[in-house]
C-alpha cells in the first residue's frame, strides 16, 4: 500500500492517486464536544508541505465517497484504503467514546450513505493515544445501534504513538479488538528514525501468536529509506511522494517480491509467503 500522506483537501485525492497512491491518510480534528470537525493538520507539519489545507470533515467524506464509488464520475479505482489520523489528543480521555460515536455517525451518513451504495474503501481508524481505546468501542456500538454492524468488516485500527508493542496489545484487549490491526511506526520526514521498532512489529505480525496484521512506516520521501522499509518487510509506506515509492517498487530487487495492492487484497489478512 502506497499511502499518500496528509490528504486533507478533496482536490488532493486525485493528485495523490494520480502520482501512484492506492491509499491516503487524512487528518481529522475534533471540536471541544468531540465532533469530528475538519480534515486539518495544522502547523507544524512535514517539511516541504503546506500544513493548513482543510475541508469540513463531512464535506471531505462526501468527496471521498465519490472517489471510491464505482460508476461515479470522480471514481478512482486504485484508491482502496483510507487512514483517518484522528487528532484526538485535543480531547479529554473521557471523551474518546463520544468521539468514536460521532465519527461513526459522520461516516455512516456521509461516506457509507447509510449502507446504500456508499464508498467502498477500507478504513483504518488511527488513534494517537492508547488511553483513547474507547474511541473504538464507541464507534463499534454506534454502527450496531444504527443497524449496520456489517460495515465493521470495512474498518481496521492503528495506534500511532510509537508505543511499546506490548502496551498496544493491552489497549486492543481492552477495546475487544481481535484482528484488522495495522501497526504504524514513524516520525515526521524532517527527522531521521531507525527501523528497530518496525522490525519488532514485523516480527509480531509474522509470529504464530502476534496480534498485528499489517505494518506501515511513515513518512518516507527518500529512495534509500524506502528500500530500508521494504527490506524490513513492511506492508505499507506512507509518503509525500507516491511516485518515489512506486519507482523503487519497480526496481529489479523489489518488483518480484512486492506489488501494489488492489481492492481484491484484504488489508486485514496477514500476508503469508
Curated annotation (Swiss-Prot):
Q: Give the GO terms filed under biological process for this record.
A: killing of cells of another organism; lipid catabolic process
* Cross-referenced CDD domains: GDPD_like_SMaseD_PLD
> Can you quote the record's cofactor note?
Binds 1 Mg(2+) ion per subunit.
Q: One Pfam family for this entry, by name?
A: GDPD_2
The role this protein plays is: Dermonecrotic toxins cleave the phosphodiester linkage between the phosphate and headgroup of certain phospholipids (sphingolipid and lysolipid substrates), forming an alcohol (often choline) and a cyclic phosphate. This toxin acts on sphingomyelin (SM). It may also act on ceramide phosphoethanolamine (CPE), lysophosphatidylcholine (LPC) and lysophosphatidylethanolamine (LPE), but not on lysophosphatidylserine (LPS), and lysophosphatidylglycerol (LPG). It acts by transphosphatidylation, releasing exclusively cyclic phosphate products as second products.
Obligatory cofactor(s)? Mg(2+)
Recorded E.C. number(s)?
4.6.1.-
- Tissue specificity: Expressed by the venom gland.
Active site (catalytic residues): 5, 41
UniProt-recorded Gene Ontology molecular function terms: lyase activity; metal ion binding; phosphoric diester hydrolase activity; toxin activity
Record localization: Secreted
The yes or no answer to whether the keyword Repeat is present is no
Residues engaged in binding Mg(2+): 25, 27, 85
Q: What is this protein called?
A: Dermonecrotic toxin LdSicTox-alphaIB3aii
Q: Which domain of life is it from?
A: Eukaryota
Give me the disulphide-bonded residues: 45-51, 47-190
